[in-house]
Amino acid sequence: MIRICPIVRSKVPLLGTFLRSDSWLAPHALALRRAICKNVALRSYSVNSEQPKHTFDISKLTRNEIQQLRELKRARERKFKDRTVAFYFSSVAVLFLGLAYAAVPLYRAICARTGFGGIPITDRRKFTDDKLIPVDTEKRIRISFTSEVSQILPWKFVPQQREVYVLPGETALAFYKAKNYSDKDIIGMATYSIAPGEAAQYFNKIQCFCFEEQKLAAGEEIDMPVFFFIDPDFASDPAMRNIDDIILHYTFFRAHYGDGTAVSDSKKEPEMNADEKAASLANAAILSPEVIDTRKDNSN
């Protein structure tokens, strides 16, 4: 019987049967064994033996060869460090670029929720029923209205009432009037602010023309409403004790279209859906008498 190596016998058990001298498959099995032993390198060492390591005796190298090896090693380390530093600075640059793009909408979102920076609160989750109950107090807050128009916008934009007086928790409706003096249809967008800024956290707008862009045809004139209330917590805040006057200021800019969306010098607020608009109009029945009287005076 032809002898085969133990590794081949363990890997291919039937090969021993085929290698018997009386088997007609012996020549073919022998050729197969040689191919297996050659490919898996089983001729000279067993399966438990480790793969030979390629080593060399450094003492046989010349001084120049050793110096070249050291230079090669330092070059590889320097290349790795340079690549790491480049990756680090690229990551930092991308991070700051992303923060720069997200800073403006993030700032406006925070201001819309907290009233920071003189931005009135527009978070509709705060418009609960308990917030719309007027506080029983004799102190009314004077709300003054001001306006401004961008120099490149040929509009006239003015408040229809100079001021109204409201109680904390009392809803109020005011109007602005806008007219397009050009011979072309123009789309405008309004930004707003509250003064003093610390009172902005209590100024809540339920419905406002500034929530969406406004399109005026050539020569068209329209009334623009703003429906708002002062949070009842205003009356109990010691920091608001000496604040009797609040100014609501609007600035209109011309909208420009780049990628199909309108943009101005300031991002507009998210547009309310149909249900929210319907709820706002339904609440308009609770109006301040001062606003109604002022509205009538202006119409007369």
UniProtKB/Swiss-Prot annotation:
GO terms for biological process: aerobic respiration; cell redox homeostasis; mitochondrial cytochrome c oxidase assembly; protein-containing complex assembly. Disulfide bonds: none annotated. It is a single-pass membrane protein. Keywords: Copper, Membrane, Mitochondrion, Mitochondrion inner membrane, Transit peptide, Transmembrane, Transmembrane helix. InterPro entries: CtaG/Cox11_dom_sf (IPR023471), Cyt_c_oxidase_assmbl_CtaG (IPR007533). The keyword Transcription regulation does not apply. It holds the Pfam family CtaG_Cox11. GO terms for molecular function: copper ion binding. It is found in: Mitochondrion inner membrane. Residues 106-300 are mitochondrial intermembrane. One of its GO terms (cellular component) is mitochondrial inner membrane. The chain crosses the membrane at residues 85-105. Belongs to the COX11/CtaG family. Exerts its effect at some terminal stage of cytochrome c oxidase synthesis, probably by being involved in the insertion of the copper B into subunit I. HAMAP family: CtaG. PANTHER family: CYTOCHROME C OXIDASE ASSEMBLY PROTEIN COX11, MITOCHONDRIAL-RELATED (PTHR21320:SF3), CYTOCHROME C OXIDASE ASSEMBLY PROTEIN COX11-RELATED (PTHR21320). This is Cytochrome c oxidase assembly protein COX11, mitochondrial. The lineage of its organism: Eukaryota, Fungi, Dikarya, Ascomycota, Saccharomycotina.
